[in-house]
Amino acid sequence: VWAVDWDRKLFDELIPLPEGTSYNSYYIEGSEKTALIDTVDPAKTQELFNNLDYLNVKKIDYVIANHAEQDHSGSLPAVIKKFPGAKIVTNEKCKGFLKDFMPELNDGDFITVADKQEISLGNRTLQFYLAPWVHWPETMMTFLKEDRILFPCDFFGSHVAISDPFDTAHTYTSAKRYYAEIMSPFRNVIKKNMEIVRSINPAMICPSHGVVHTDPARVMGWYDEWIKDDVKNYAIILYISMHHSMKAAAYHLADSLANKGVRTKLYNLSNVDIGEIAMDLVDAATVIVCAPTVLAGAHPVAASIVYLFNALRPKTKFLSLITGWNWIEKAQESLAAMVPNFKGELIAPLKVQGYPKKGDLEAIEAMAQAVADKHKSINIM
């Protein structure tokens, strides 16, 4: 009983949605009780109700809230108003979040559950698995035991608007993009929860965004690849240039890396989809940022991308900087201070005064050689 948002182009006022998105809600009918797994964004509440009416749903006993974020919980007040007597089933932490976000909810609207607790619908049973920090601290998953269907909310999701939830034509790219943008900071926690998912052996995985996975082994195999510590012989160059100096440096670096056998991708930060960068960060061994000094600091666009790099906590092994300046150089210092989460190695950065000259170009070539040597040292070349 989902709602498809064909027109939404931005999530959290940050993440581009080139393919739109969907908010997946699932209705389960047992012999004695009924349940609704998650709701939809409040802008799409009426679509949810239209779908429930189409199924002639007259009564809902339980509304499962796997996650408090409003794209899944925002219709809760309207749902319990439409279906008097319906109880919101969630964990204690999520209950607190929901009451913060929607003050009209009160304690009497809730049933709280603990890890592995079950609720019977008669001939069907819901079991709950707490999964803190698989995105948010209150996240949980719901398992329909008899049918072996897992409802993991954002886990295994994808931002894509499609007319058929079983359409797997472009699942890989949308799933990787979603993982990269939203789930990758929690990579180590996801490793543990992958073990939980394998232990219950679902026949189907039904996330709260995007495609339903009728072949769980496929998407779980992708996640296994993305969460492991291995990186690839791949360097991404992130540059911003006001008067072509940093562009020249970035292009020369890209050519030098390619000549030394390092697969390379160049991003002009003045016009970039951050989702594409996030996807590349899942695999890249090396990241190099090229940015000029602006008002005694790093260019703000470069600073914002470096901030995101730090927040995403990628498994990148090597990082370096090329910074431009004329009368004062402060970009390097400010950018280097913005990556406390980076646990890899900083390759000696460079400073370029004005347009890159012969000595600068030679130093850039030496940086490319250093990157290639580092890649060889970890056996990816």
What is the role of each PLM region?
Residues 238-260:
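Short, charged N-terminal beta->alpha structural module
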Residues 162-165, 170-205, 210-211, 252-265, ...:
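FMN-binding flavodoxin-like domain, especially the glycine-rich phosphate-binding loop
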Residues 37-39, 60-68, 88-91, 150-154, ...:
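Active-site neighborhood of phospho(di)ester-bond hydrolases with catalytic His/Asp-centered motifs
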Residues 43-89:
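Active-site metal-binding motif and surrounding structural segment of the metallo-beta-lactamase
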Residues 1, 6-11, 147-166:
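Short, solvent-exposed beta-strand-terminating loops
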Residues 75, 273-277:
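Short acidic active-site motifs
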Residues 89-139, 186, 192:
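Metallo-beta-lactamase
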Residues 1-33:
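Zn-dependent metallo-beta-lactamase
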